[in-house]
């Protein structure tokens, strides 16, 4: 081992960012109150930030329910805030992120995908374009690429081959980002879902043998 880097950023982060940018508009994201104030961004980020315990606790707190009811009353588009209230009452954050994940996977092969979301008595259909997904996941993607280049810099050598694993390694967008950062270095993949566990098991064997 000549170098290593790491950060808690992965597939969930891609799904969360895509859900935030592409799926929260029908729930009031980007709308205003009757007095012209923008709806608070955190009310649309916190319910889908499923890997952030603090954000989840804030959104699903009893105090926040009062804030959501107030925003619903003051909203120019109250029907959208009614859906956000349903996210609170029915704990829909995980299902929204799951819909984003399904769209992300579909957009690996197609230019557009439709996310179908059941909320209240409606079945919402939200179209997501591949270009919109690329823009939505730019922040976590950039973090991942920075980790790759940092590891190469610390190691002081260009790798002979890059091994990508984990579910997100299937994404052509991430693979293209790695190829751009390290051109002319071949990328290989193993078991997308088993390699991480196998690697951890082997390292545990080294540590606790």
Enumerate the language-model features and the residues they cover.
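Phosphate/ATP-binding catalytic cores across multiple sugar-kinase/actin-like superfamilies
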Residues: 99, 103-106, 135-162, 177, ...
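Short, well-ordered loop/turn and helix-capping segments at boundaries between secondary-structure elements
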Residues: 20-29, 180, 184, 202, ...
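Generic beta-strand/beta-sheet core signal
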Residues: 4, 110, 118, 165-167, ...
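Adenine-nucleotide phosphate-binding core of ATP-dependent small-molecule kinases
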Residues: 85-93, 121-152
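Conserved phosphate-binding/catalytic loops in two-lobed NTP-binding clefts
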Residues: 8-9, 175-202
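Short glycine-rich phosphate-binding loop at a beta-alpha junction
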Residues: 31-37, 47, 151, 155-167
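Glycine-rich phosphate-binding loops at beta-strand->alpha-helix junctions
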Residues: 88, 92-93, 157-178
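Phosphate-binding glycine-rich/basic clefts of nucleotide- and phosphate-handling proteins
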Residues: 1-119
């Amino acid at each position: 081992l000549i170098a290593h880097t790491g950060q808690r950023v992965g597939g969930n982060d891609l799904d969360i960012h895509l859900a935030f940018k592409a799926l929260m508009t029908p729930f009031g994201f980007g709308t205003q109150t009757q007095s012209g104030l923008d709806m608070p961004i955190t009310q649309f980020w916190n319910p889908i930030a499923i890997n952030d315990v603090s954000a989840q606790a804030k959104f699903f707190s009893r105090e926040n329910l009062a804030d959501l009811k107030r925003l619903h009353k003051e909203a120019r588009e109250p029907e959208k805030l009614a859906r956000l209230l349903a996210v609170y009452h029915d704990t829909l954050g995980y299902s929204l992120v799951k819909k984003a994940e399904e769209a992300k996977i579909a957009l690996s092969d197609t230019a557009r995908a439709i996310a179908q979301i059941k909320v209240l008595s409606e079945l919402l259909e939200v179209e997501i374009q591949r270009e919109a997904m690329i823009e939505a996941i730019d922040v976590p993607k950039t973090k991942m690429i920075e980790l790759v280049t940092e590891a190469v810099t610390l190691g002081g050598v260009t790798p002979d081959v890059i091994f990508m694993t984990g579910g997100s390694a299937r994404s052509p967008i991430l693979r293209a980002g790695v190829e751009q950062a390290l051109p002319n270095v071949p990328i290989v993949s193993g078991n997308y879902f088993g390699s991480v566990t196998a690697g951890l098991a082997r390292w545990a064997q080294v540590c606790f043998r």
